Amino acid sequence: MGWSLPKIPEKEMVSSWSPWVCLFIIILGLFTGLIVAVLKSPAAGLPSLSSGAWLPFTAWTFAGISAVIAVYSTWWEILATRVWNWNEWCRSTRLKWCLGAHQYLIIHSHVFIAADTGLLSRLVHTQEEDRADTAVLTLLPGESLTPGISRFEQLLSHLIAQIIPSIRLRYPSGPLRIIVQTSGRDKESESHAFHRVWSAGSSSWIVEIHFQDADLSIGCWNQFIESTKWPVLVLALHYRLPDDVLPEFATALFMVHPSMLNQSEGKNTLRLFRAMPLNTRTLATELSELRDMALTPASRKHLVWHSGLPDAPRQSVSRVLNELSVPLYDDIGTGGVIDYDRVCVRYDRLAGWAMIGAAAEMAAYGPACQWLLLEGKDDAWAVTLGNAAPAVGSDRFVIPPPFPGGSVLMALLLNAGLYSLMISYFPSTAFSWSGIALLLLSLIVTFPGLAILLRRITARLQRPEFIRAARHSGKE
């Protein structure tokens, strides 16, 4: 799945730095220093302690021991930082993917009108199969019908009249984004007709209108989730055209951003999640990843719709869902799976909004968790509807970064060396208040500075390796 959860393996934490190694370095340093002192002692014997000859030698010995311990601590810090960086990037990547997949708008109100008025009731088996020999192909059977733009304007007026009262109740004024997708080709005439209908009684909003072609993918829906917090009104319909034999349908969905509702209002409302790219050739893997994204609770029963799938995936949907142990509504459709092309008709790309409208209407019969699988000529998508907010970042916990012991020791040695040079070349400055202030300022800067610099360098060198691992983790 193009938005599947990354599977980058985390690395095991490195073992903590060992005090025994530090003790060994100290003993080895003292022993080495003692050997050097004996080898370099004058022929007359070792100098006395009161002579002062031991002071610089002792200083150099402890400086060497400190340098070796600093190198060991820095090496351990680099290893620990690499592991910490890697694991944090893994968790951050998973969280980012989940946050992206969990984007949704709340369906505040909807209208779904099908030419076959008994479609949903038959799917839930509350009405017997009594379809007439001649299928009903048009909406509003009591009104006159003129194919073309006149029919579009007629159905649009009816659809807007149905949805506008609920919009006014929730959102009486303000900016509103409107998406119109129809089966017609003359978008300019549709635009003129839409503005006539809309301006007749819906002038309270500042509208931004998007007319979409009939063959536009449902994946384009994602841009409207990501771009703004404006409410969105989707109007999708297939209206009668000359020489057209497909049954008409019309659907309207008024959706708002979760921030527009208080907690009690948005608790059990229906949510429409972003469309997820789907590879129907590996349907089992794709549906497994869709389940793992936890858009809907795994324990809840699901209803699955599909349209446009090739023969092999279409015939294997039920089997794959059973193998994945996805609980289904056995009493709806065919064991919880609805082939929209068979029970209704195939609308190609327009089937996306047709199924979403039908699924929103179906929620009134009980199914709140629904998956919609749609394949077109060039791509395929999976859309999820649910009435529960997804759990985001359930594996997100704070792991403190490794202690910068090596950086601190390096900073101490660096400042000690610089101060020694200052004493050698500028003794008056070194023992003055300005020299002490300069030393303190250097300590303040180098203590955090070296730690930050080491982490930045480590991350910069390690990032290409992580990117390669992410690309080979099954991501497209």
Predicted features and spans:
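Conserved "HGTGT" condensation-loop signature of ketosynthase/thiolase-family condensing enzymes
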Residues: 1-229, 236-242, 251-364, 371-476
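Short, solvent-exposed loop/turn segments at conserved positions within beta-propeller repeat blades
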Residues: 245-247
